[in-house]
Amino acid sequence: MVDLDEFEVVLEELVKEVKRRDTIAAVLISTSFVLFGFLALVLLNVIRLEEFMRGIVAIVSLIAIWVLMTAGVYILLSMPLPELPTRIVADSKGVMELMKRNYGGKIYITRQSYRNLPPKVGARMNLEIVDVSDEEVAKYLNHGVELAESIAAAKKLKAKVVSDRKMKVDGVEIIKAEDLF
């Protein structure tokens, strides 16, 4: 049902982004602690400075500490994680439109939609056939058999359906191929 290779690639990218984000935040926060230690040494007179210079160094250090700590915590807490790629289920018309637009990603398709495609399309596109139960398909038959199967598959995979019309059915978004790009 779900391609494990595709999942591993997405997971690796996600881990890289999280590691990068955490490293930047850790460097900023640890630098602020080092500056705080420097400030303590200046204020305790371990590092001897004139009274006037000690005040300037203390104020500049406090501002730098505050900025670095705030930036580190902000990056750590609020930087959004990258979005996972959208899964796409398409009927035969949607697959043909995606092929015209040279879509290179994986497209989930039902057996009925696959039967309606010309033979060359199956070889050119990255298609994966998804089986759906007849009970699920029966709920959406008023939209046509092919689209009903695609809607049931999209509901199963938590995906969007690409077709020749645009609507929303039972929480599943049906879009046109041009809306995807």
From Swiss-Prot:
Regions that span the bilayer: 24-46, 55-77
One cellular component term from this protein's GO annotations in UniProt: plasma membrane
Compartment(s) where it occurs, according to its Swiss-Prot or TrEMBL record: Cell membrane
Keyword annotations from UniProtKB, A to Z: Cell membrane, Membrane, Transmembrane, Transmembrane helix
Principal location class: membrane
Membrane topology: Multi-pass membrane protein
Name of the protein in question: Uncharacterized protein AF_2025
Organism: Archaeoglobus fulgidus (strain ATCC 49558 / DSM 4304 / JCM 9628 / NBRC 100126 / VC-16)
